Structures are given as structure tokens and as C-alpha cells.
């Protein structure tokens, strides 16, 4: 289930659904987020595309577009392993992953898998780039 805070926009076109939070929770969609959305729509023709800019939860300046979580539901994923699905997403976003995007969490599902579970996973809290993880000396 998506929270009201997460879903600030809902667009439905020709049976496709796009849910978005907006840039770092501000409600505005930045250029990197817009490029990610456009490229995934063009490459995968998703039935559902949920994109969340999680940069605000990390040690980056306000308004950054560096950390994203995406759920892509596409019939293009039928018969593919999770690794193959992720490779398709990475190929579509090669420019962004080679530049401004530092982290991308991907949920790539078939339409049948999404009908069974339409929950968007949550990310763990940021430990910061210079902080040690628990249990690490």
C-alpha cells in the first residue's frame, strides 16, 4: 500500500499507471527524475512505473537527485530472471547511472507478479557515506 506522502502524482494513460513522489519529496520533479521516467517508459512500456527519489534521506544537499527506488511492471520481463530484468533497467538508464545517480533500487516485476504483490519495498535508513555499519570495527 502506498502512503499519501509517497504518492503526490498519479497519471493514467492508455492503461498505464505512473506513481511519483517528486524530487526528494518536495512535490517537484527534477530533470534526472524526469529523464529516468521517460527512458523507462520508452524502453519497457511499463504497465506500472513507480519512481521514488530517496535522496532526501541521505547525506546529500537538499534537492539532490542521487538515490532512487523504482518499481517497473512490464510484460517485457516475462520469462526473464531477476538479473536479466535489472540489466534491462540498467541499460535504459546507462547515462544516469554513469553520472548523477549514485544508487538505484529496482523492483522489476511481470504484471502477474504485481497483481500478487503491489507493495513498493522500503529502503533502510542511510548510514552516510563515512559512517560504519553496525558490527564493523
From Swiss-Prot:
Tissue: Widely expressed.
Chain positions found as Phosphoserine: 81
Keyword annotations of the record: Mitochondrion, Phosphoprotein
Gene Ontology biological-process entries: cell redox homeostasis; intracellular iron ion homeostasis; iron-sulfur cluster assembly
Entries under InterPro entries matching the protein: BolA, BolA-like_sf, BolA/IbaG_stress_morph_reg
Function noted in UniProt: Acts as a mitochondrial iron-sulfur (Fe-S) cluster assembly factor that facilitates (Fe-S) cluster insertion into a subset of mitochondrial proteins. Probably acts together with the monothiol glutaredoxin GLRX5. May protect cells against oxidative stress.
Complexes and interactors: Interacts with GLRX5.
Name of the protein: BolA-like protein 1
Amino acid at each position: 500500500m502506498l502512503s499519501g506522502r509517497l504518492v503526490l502524482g498519479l497519471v493514467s494513460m492508455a492503461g498505464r499507471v505512473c506513481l511519483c513522489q517528486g524530487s526528494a519529496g518536495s512535490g517537484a520533479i527534477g530533470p534526472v527524475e524526469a529523464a529516468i521516467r521517460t527512458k523507462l517508459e520508452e524502453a519497457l512500456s511499463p504497465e506500472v512505473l513507480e519512481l521514488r527519489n530517496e535522496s532526501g534521506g541521505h547525506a546529500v544537499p537538499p534537492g539532490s537527485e542521487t538515490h532512487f527506488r523504482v518499481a517497473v511492471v512490464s510484460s517485457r520481463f516475462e520469462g526473464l530472471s531477476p538479473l536479466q530484468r535489472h540489466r534491462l533497467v540498467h541499460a535504459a538508464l546507462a547515462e544516469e547511472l554513469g553520472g548523477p545517480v549514485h544508487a538505484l533500487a529496482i523492483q522489476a516485476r511481470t504484471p502477474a507478479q504485481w497483481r500478487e504483490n503491489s507493495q513498493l519495498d522500503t529502503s533502510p535508513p542511510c548510514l552516510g557515506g563515512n559512517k560504519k555499519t553496525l558490527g564493523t570495527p
